Structure formats: structure tokens, C-alpha cells
């Protein structure tokens, strides 16, 4: 019933204003796919590689599963900039749907132009929003994460410093002004020593 309203909002939305985009997303809660499909049908943004940035931003915030195939196409399309492809991967990462998790696994496979970004999102979401989709097997099969292969190594604790020399000994030392000037030159890069430094 509200699809026509959202289409009009999408037409008028200044997508550079994150609050406007968020307002559409909040209003579309629990019906994101229906709203996205209506907006896509009416605005006709063209093939995924030709979407205007405004439509890509709306798609990012309408977290339904409907645009998954389009987002996957954008993520792997080398005619798009790296930032545009990464934004498509990020858009998939916010979709709470088992298909989104599977698409992300595909994007994290060998040869994918967004393998690194997809892998990072998988690791982030596998213990969070997507934990219920049991990604463990897919992560293990693709060599991304296998908890059984993790080796825990002890971090060596450094030896404690020896005792400091007595103050009397330090006071007996003769200073070397040229060496002191050199040492202070390193310090004044960040600190102020007398009239010099930052």
C-alpha cells in the first residue's frame, strides 16, 4: 500500500544526505524487498553497472534480499571503480538473509575482484548478524577461517630492566654538548625543548 509513497520519496530524496536515506530505510522496515522492488521498477536505473550513485545509496539502506543478484553483479563488474564495487559488497553485508551470506562466500572465493573486502565482511558477520546461517563450513572449505587450525603461541615477556645506577653516579657523568644537541634534535620533532620544537 505504501510502495507509491516510497517511490515518490526515492525520487525526491537527496541521497547525499544520510538522514534522508536513513528515513527511507526506517520507514521501509520489514518490507525492504517490496519497497526496493517497487522503487527499482519505477525509477528504472538500468543494469547494475549503470546505476546512478543515488540508486546505489538507496539500495545500500534498503536491506532486503531483492537486490542481491544486482549487488553481486556490481561487486564483480570491473568497469566500476573499486569504491563502487566495495560499496556493493558493503550493501550485501547489511542484508540479514541466508542468501546474502552465500553470495558473500562466493565473492570471497579465489579470483573474485573483491575477495579481500568480502572476506573481511564474512569474518565480521559470521559471529554477528549471520551467525545463524552457519557459515563455519563455508569459511573452512574456502580456507578463510578454520578454528581447528589455529595455533596459539605464547608471547614472550621481556626481561625486567636491571637496577638503575645510583643518582650520585649519574651526577658524576660529564656531558657532551654536541651529542646532547643531536639527541635533542630528535626530541624537538614532537616536543618543545627551550625555545625549539613543536
Which residue ranges define each predicted feature?
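Long, ordered, helix-rich scaffold segments
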Residues: 1-183
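Gly/Gly-Pro-rich "capping" loops immediately C-terminal to redox-active cysteine motifs
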Residues: 12, 196-198
Amino acid at each position: 500500500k505504501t510502495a507509491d509513497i516510497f517511490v515518490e520519496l526515492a525520487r525526491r530524496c537527496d541521497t547525499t544526505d544520510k538522514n534522508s536515506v536513513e528515513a527511507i530505510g526506517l520507514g521501509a522496515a520489514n518490507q525492504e524487498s517490496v519497497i526496493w522492488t517497487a522503487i527499482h521498477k519505477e525509477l528504472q536505473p538500468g543494469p547494475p553497472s549503470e546505476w546512478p550513485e543515488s540508486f546505489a545509496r538507496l539500495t545500500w539502506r534498503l536491506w532486503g534480499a531483492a537486490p542481491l543478484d544486482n549487488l553481486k553483479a556490481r561487486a564483480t563488474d570491473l568497469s566500476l571503480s573499486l569504491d563502487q564495487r566495495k560499496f556493493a559488497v558493503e550493501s550485501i553485508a547489511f542484508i540479514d538473509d541466508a542468501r546474502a551470506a552465500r553470495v558473500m562466500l562466493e565473492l570471497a572465493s579465489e579470483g573474485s575482484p573483491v575477495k579481500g573486502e568480502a572476506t573481511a565482511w564474512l569474518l565480521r558477520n559470521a559471529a554477528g548478524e549471520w551467525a545463524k546461517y552457519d557459515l563455519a563450513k563455508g569459511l573452512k572449505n574456502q580456507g578463510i577461517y578454520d578454528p581447528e587450525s589455529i595455533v596459539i603461541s605464547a608471547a614472550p615477556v621481556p626481561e625486567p630492566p636491571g637496577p638503575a645506577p645510583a643518582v650520585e653516579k649519574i651526577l658524576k657523568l660529564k656531558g657532551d654538548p654536541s651529542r646532547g644537541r643531536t639527541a635533542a634534535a630528535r626530541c624537538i620533532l614532537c616536543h618543545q625543548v627551550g625555545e625549539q620544537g613543536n
